[in-house]
Amino acid sequence: YSCIYCQLGRTDHMTKQREMFFPVKDIIAELDRVLKDDIRFDVVTIVGEGEPTLYLGLGELITDIQTRIEMPVAVITNGALLYDTQVRSELFDADIVLPTFDAFDQASFKKINRPHRSLDYEMVKQGLINFSREYQGQLWLELMLMSEINDDLESLQKYAAALNEIKY
């Protein structure tokens, strides 16, 4: 995605290809360094400068983090890859998943999310619906309402209809 509201600006390289951006062991080593500082925290959140589900080591990372802490592990995601059964399976081990759901049809999806050209709204929505029915953890939906873009009564009614299909 290259969402119109992203605080990081436009996405330079649009992809939906999953990659091993960093070795899992390097991320875990950094976590271990932080844990040695005995800092109090409530949750470990996996998020990045980009979409976490593009990371091919996500499932292993979640599992490795959970072996080191007793706190919940959360993943913040735009939800674009939830149509992929492998991605959904990897997220099942997270305690909390926070997918973005801020479009209600193809036109709003293109306007707000500016997705990869091969993604369409129905595919992404169905992936979220499927995930919501399979996932046993906490599902926290992120809905971004923007003045004069998607906050009018008609848009809100369309959101409500779409949200009724999701188990949360």
Positions of predicted regions on the chain:
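Short, compositionally biased "basic patch" segments
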Residues: 1-6, 31-34, 102
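Canonical Radical SAM [4Fe-4S] cluster-binding loop centered on the CxxxCxxC motif
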Residues: 1-24
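Short, conserved beta-strand segments within well-ordered enzyme catalytic domains
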Residues: 7, 43-47, 74-76, 98
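Short, basic/glycine-rich phosphate-binding loops at helix/coil junctions
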Residues: 7-12, 40-44, 103-108, 138-140
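Short coil/turn segments at secondary-structure boundaries
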Residues: 18-22, 49-56
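Short Fe-S-cluster ligation motifs
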Residues: 26-49
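Conserved AdoMet/S-adenosylmethionine-binding subsite of the radical SAM
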Residues: 53-168
